[in-house]
Amino acid sequence: MTTAPPAPDVATEPTQRARARLNWPLVLIAGYMAPVGLQAALLPRSFFDSFPVGRGWIAAAGGAYNEHLARDVGVLFVSLVIATAWTATTRAGDRAVAAAWIVQGVAHLAFHAAHLHDLPGGDQVALIATLAVVPVLAAAALRSPTSRPARP
């Protein structure tokens, strides 16, 4: 006597399919960059003086505090995070968003790599490592199966 296969769990099947369609590297970029953008947009002086977590990397790089610039950078990051979260879940334009993060991330990394002299050695390593996260994840997003067009 053969038994019928178990009925699919209709409650979890759509959720599992939705998770499989997510471009996970883009989800990670959105989660990684949201706090950065929110702090710069909402608390620009704190962002300038103490980012990240009290280390003061931005202030140490020199230059005068500029509230307008800090808020604009924060809102720009929040805007990119929204576009990233949208595309990670809809798959619409994920390659373009990943490419945008690569351009931003590599340029940001290159600038800071050329201006490490005001930071202690441990902070230099930490800065380069944390700045490398976004372009590495963005490159992974380009290679994600969800970023490729479906084959007929």
Language-model regions: role of each:
Residues 2-35:
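Cytosolic juxtamembrane helix and N-cap/initiation of the first transmembrane helix
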Residues 81-97:
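Juxtamembrane helix-break-helix junctions at the cytosolic face
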Residues 133-152:
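Membrane-water interface at the C-terminal end of transmembrane alpha helices
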Residues 73-81, 131-134:
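Core segments of transmembrane alpha-helices
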Residues 25-28, 69-75, 100-103:
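Physicochemical signature of membrane-embedded alpha-helices that form the seven-helix bundle of GPCRs
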Residues 95, 110-126:
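Membrane-helix boundary connector in multi-pass membrane proteins
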Residues 33-36, 102-113:
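Aromatic-anchored segments of alpha-helical transmembrane domains
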Residues 31-69, 74:
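Hydrophobic transmembrane helix segments
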